[in-house]
């Protein structure tokens, strides 16, 4: 989220600070240093961000490699962080394409788009959401009159959200896909975000 200092920004600052230190202190053995850095950036035995300290360190490790211009790796690759580290020390190479990457094991795999009825539904008498649904995907609870959406029928057109007077129906989208102006982010076979590099303009949004 641009303009807002978040915990992601905090981690990013730490990572770039450590990479800059490695570049400045040329006497340090880079291969040993990079292996130790995830433990320095994410100390202790309990995760602070994802409740899994090992996952946090693995993600930080890949972020360190990407910050040094090395390629993004999958979780299936068994190799130390220092693998091919010498490629980062070539003055003619700034980074290994692509510029924008998704660390797959860091992705939450959230839904691309879904429409939800929140607790704000008042079970109103008019129920315009039911009336405008082109697929008859909304039914009313027989006890409290609140709306419920059948995900099997819903085509996610959003008309119900548009007509709700209480703003009780929300449209949830995958944040990265919603931010992409060229529709370059889709979903892979594992439900993780995936970049179509033929569309991607590397804007970083």
Question: What are these regions, as identified by a protein language model?
Answer:
Residues 196, 200-204:
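Solenoidal tandem-repeat scaffolds enriched in leucines and small polar residues
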Residues 1-163, 167-179, 183-186, 191, ...:
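Ferredoxin-type iron-sulfur electron-transfer modules and their immediate structural context
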